C-alpha cells in the first residue's frame, strides 16, 4: 500500500457547500429524482473500499452512444483520475425514447486522496453520440469523496 498523498487535506470542503454522500448498499434510503430536470438522475454508491465507487444513471430519451463520467475537485477544478475514470465509467447504450435506467452499478475509482480524507468532487455525466461522435454534458452533481489507497 502506498502512503497518504494528502490530497483531501489540501482541498478542504468549503463550509457552505451543499454536497451529496455516496450511498452504501445496505442503505434503506429511498432514491428520489434529485434534479430540477425530472428526466435525469445520478446516484453514486460506495463500493468495498474508500475511493471505489459505482454509479447508476437514469435519463430521458437518448440516441445510441456512450455514457461516461468526468470528475473535478470542487475548489480548484482539478481533474480527478482523468483518463482512467473516463475508461472505467464508460458504458455503451442503445437508443431509448423514454426515461429509464441507462447505467447500472458501473464501477469507477477515484485515486486522488486517502481513505477517510474527504473532499468535494463535481461528478459530471457525459454522453458521446455513436452517430456524430459529439460529446455533451448531461448533468453534474457534487459528492463528498475519498481516494483509494493502493
PLM features: residue spans?
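Contiguous beta-strand segments within globular domains
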Residues: 22-70
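Hydrophobic residues positioned within well-ordered beta-strands of beta-sheet architectures
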Residues: 53-55, 121-123, 141
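Surface-exposed loop/edge segments in extracytoplasmic proteins
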Residues: 77-89, 137
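Short, solvent-exposed, Trp/other aromatic-anchored flexible loops in extracytoplasmic proteins
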Residues: 87-131
Amino acid at each position: 500500500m502506498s502512503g497518504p498523498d494528502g490530497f483531501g487535506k489540501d482541498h478542504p470542503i468549503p463550509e457552505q457547500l451543499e454536497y451529496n454522500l455516496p450511498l452504501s448498499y445496505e442503505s434503506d434510503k429511498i432514491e428520489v429524482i434529485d434534479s430540477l430536470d425530472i428526466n435525469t438522475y445520478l446516484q453514486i454508491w460506495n463500493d468495498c473500499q474508500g475511493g471505489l465507487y459505482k454509479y447508476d444513471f437514469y435519463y430521458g430519451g437518448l440516441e445510441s452512444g456512450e455514457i461516461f463520467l468526468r470528475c473535478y475537485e470542487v475548489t480548484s477544478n482539478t481533474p480527478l483520475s482523468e483518463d482512467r475514470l473516463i475508461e472505467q465509467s464508460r458504458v455503451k447504450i442503445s437508443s431509448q425514447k423514454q426515461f429509464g435506467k441507462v447505467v447500472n452499478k458501473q464501477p469507477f475509482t477515484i485515486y486522488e486522496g486517502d481513505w477517510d480524507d474527504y473532499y468535494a468532487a463535481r461528478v459530471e455525466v457525459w454522453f458521446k453520440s455513436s452517430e456524430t461522435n459529439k460529446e455533451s454534458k448531461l448533468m453534474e452533481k457534487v459528492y463528498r469523496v475519498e481516494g483509494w489507497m493502493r
